[in-house]
């Protein structure tokens, strides 16, 4: 099998690194790196829920995604300066929120909110999938914090782990984890969000340059699921380390639970 421009095989991920405790203040803070793509993912815990959720006894999880102005080759203005949030930003923010809500029992949170913030420090393709993969680890740390604070009605509110990866058809070949040079010329482009129990959360796929047959879709999903299995192992290894910050003194730190 011939190799890609960066030396990888078609089914090979870029080097993936997950660093917990990247910043001090949030309950969960992670730097996730997929090759040259770097995303800071934080999970902050606040008391209370949105107005439409009050009185339900259930918590909420929301997410925001943004790119720093110099995350790409050409600087872009901050959306706060423009006075509006772009459609792409809204779409990805909602994707991250949906993906993580798929793995957590919101009733176990009580009326507390977990706010996920994903800020792209450097972009080289696959920023949304990197954000989801890193945000799950940040969420896991936030759940550990809530448990130590005695705010969980269920000590294991996470039903599974969540990871995501890009997959596409480039030069007629199915490839996973596309960098920008491949993503920008892919004939088919897809993002897959999966659980460590083998189920799918979301699939976003488009024939960029041409239509594609069902058999290609099946190959892409197989490649993406196999790549996600590797990401789950990386998440698991990161979460085996002790909680990186200071937990509330009222409880003993519990051993980190990974997904299911």
From Swiss-Prot:
Annotated protein name in UniProt: Ribonuclease PH
Record key words, sorted: Nucleotidyltransferase, RNA-binding, rRNA processing, Transferase, tRNA processing, tRNA-binding
Family annotation (PANTHER family): EXOSOME COMPLEX COMPONENT (PTHR11953), EXOSOME COMPLEX COMPONENT RRP41 (PTHR11953:SF0)
Organism for this UniProt entry: Mycolicibacterium gilvum (strain PYR-GCK) (Mycobacterium gilvum (strain PYR-GCK))
InterPro entries linked to this entry: ExoRNase_PH_dom1, ExoRNase_PH_dom2, ExoRNase_PH_dom2_sf, PNPase/RNase_PH_dom_sf, Ribosomal_Su5_D2-typ_SF, RNase_PH, RNase_PH_bac-type, RNase_PH_CS
Enzyme Commission (EC) number: 2.7.7.56
SUPFAM superfamilies in the record: Ribonuclease PH domain 2-like, Ribosomal protein S5 domain 2-like
Family: Belongs to the RNase PH family.
HAMAP family assigned to the protein according to its UniProt record, in alphabetical order: RNase_PH
Its job: Phosphorolytic 3'-5' exoribonuclease that plays an important role in tRNA 3'-end maturation. Removes nucleotide residues following the 3'-CCA terminus of tRNAs; can also add nucleotides to the ends of RNA molecules by using nucleoside diphosphates as substrates, but this may not be physiologically important. Probably plays a role in initiation of 16S rRNA degradation (leading to ribosome degradation) during starvation.
Recorded catalytic activity of this chain's protein: tRNA(n+1) + phosphate = tRNA(n) + a ribonucleoside 5'-diphosphate
Residues where phosphate binds: 88, 126-128
PROSITE patterns associated with the record: RIBONUCLEASE_PH
Pfam families reported in the protein's UniProt record: RNase_PH, RNase_PH_C
Matching NCBIfam families: RNasePH (TIGR01966)
Subunit-level organization: Homohexameric ring arranged as a trimer of dimers.
Biological-process GO terms, alphabetical: rRNA catabolic process; rRNA processing; tRNA processing
GO terms of molecular function: 3'-5'-RNA exonuclease activity; tRNA binding; tRNA nucleotidyltransferase activity
